[in-house]
Regions:
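Short coil/turn segments at beta-strand junctions that form active-site/ligand-binding loops
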Residues: 1-2, 55-57, 93, 128-129, ...
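ATP-binding/phosphotransfer module of carbohydrate and carboxylate kinases, centering on a glycine-rich
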Residues: 1-52, 173-314
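Short beta-strand segments
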Residues: 8, 60-64, 98, 131-138, ...
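Short, acidic Gly/Pro/Ser/Thr-rich loop/turn segments
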Residues: 14, 66-68, 138-142, 198, ...
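Active-site nucleophile and cofactor-binding loops and adjacent substrate-binding regions
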Residues: 33-36, 76-77, 96-103, 122-125, ...
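Short beta-strand-loop/turn "lid" adjacent to the catalytic site in phosphate-handling enzymes
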Residues: 51-97, 102, 106-115, 132, ...
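ATP-dependent carbohydrate kinase catalytic cores
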Residues: 94-125, 217-231, 235
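Glycine-rich phosphate-binding loop of actin/hexokinase-like ATP-binding domains
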Residues: 115-187, 277-282, 286, 291
């Protein structure tokens, strides 16, 4: 049986490659470098060589970016992938290139019970809209709308670039520093991997005049040993992420649930105060009861994007 090639470039440092039969999950994925289009092409060739160059029915790629005029621009990688070139490289006609958050949303209906954990909220209503929030290098959003036959349609969004709002003097002080640095302050500036490090740095400048730069691994490590600034940075970050999930649920009418995914949550999941998250998620004044009924889930699988890509070949 012919196979399909699956590739996920949602991480800027490497990509995942896997083979699967149509409609089936890949058994294993392998990490390969992809810092340039030449390195991407070489990695694909090496991967296929290592698997005896199987017959390919088609291929699917997920990446952070968007398609324009037959090419997929990937700002995190700094290069553009052309459809015609990839078709020629693989000797195929059937090729899908989708946004990584869209591929995650496509996976939601295929997840096993063990791959989803409910973190807060009520029971919701079956058969209505769902939403997926993907927080990693960026902040992505997608809607999942069922048709009359129960088949999902994915609504791609760019909600991570929506304006950031604040609800406390502390949040406002962080916002002011980010505004001075960037001008426009989007939600992605705070509710992402880089955003967590930025929030930590802002708190240091506000409280101690500390201007040193840090990476997110340092912040998480400090939080694990009880560092007050790191703990507060995660608290602020989770609050803004909860607000993002809440606003998305309202705007999409996601009564069937909100699904949280991404590298940020993999890093700080055990440090999140889910009670505080729920309080921020449901704090919508007259619509608090409406929000309290919406379930919020955390996805727990390493290859969410690849699972989503398999749905394109059912």
């Amino acid at each position: 049986m012919a196979s399909v090639l699956l590739s996920d470039l949602s991480n800027s440092a490497y990509m995942k490659l896997a083979l699967a039969h149509p409609g089936e999950r890949p058994e294993v994925s392998t990490l390969y470098p992809c810092k340039s289009i030449e390195e991407f092409n070489g990695s694909v060739v090496d991967f296929l060589d290592a698997h005896d160059n199987p017959d390919l029915l088609g291929a699917a790629v997920s990446a952070c970016g968007w398609e324009v005029e037959g090419g997929f621009s990937m700002p995190n990688h700094g290069y553009r992938m052309e459809r015609k070139d990839l078709r020629e490289l693989l000797n195929i006609q059937r090729l899908h290139i989708v946004n990584d958050c869209v591929s995650r949303a496509m996976a939601v209906e295929r997840l096993f019970d063990s791959e989803v954990i409910k973190v807060c909220g009520g029971d919701g209503e079956d058969g209505l809209t769902k939403a997926l929030i993907g927080s990693g290098r960026g902040l992505g959003v997608a809607g999942i709308v069922q048709d009359d036959l129960g088949n999902p349609t994915i609504l791609p969004c760019e909600g991570g670039h929506a304006d950031l709002a604040t609800i406390s003097p502390r949040e406002a002080s962080v916002f002011a520093l980010l505004e001075a640095r960037y001008g426009h302050v989007s939600r992605e500036r705070v509710a992402s991997i880089n955003g967590l490090a930025e929030v930590y740095e802002c708190l240091g400048r506000i409280d101690e005049g500390d201007t040193r730069r840090v990476n997110v691994a340092e912040v998480v490590a400090l939080a694990h040993i009880g560092d007050a600034r790191a703990t507060e940075a995660i608290s602020l970050c989770q609050g803004w992420l909860a607000a993002m999930a809440s606003d998305t649920a309202l705007m999409l009418g996601a009564r069937s649930g909100v699904y949280l995914s991404g590298e940020l949550l993999e890093l700080i999941g055990e440090l999140i105060d889910w009670k505080a998250f729920e309080a921020r998620f449901t704090d919508k004044g007259r619509l608090t009861a409406y929000m309290q009924d919406i379930p919020v889930y955390l996805t727990r699988t390493a290859d969410l994007e690849l699972i989503g890509l398999t749905t394109l070949f059912r």
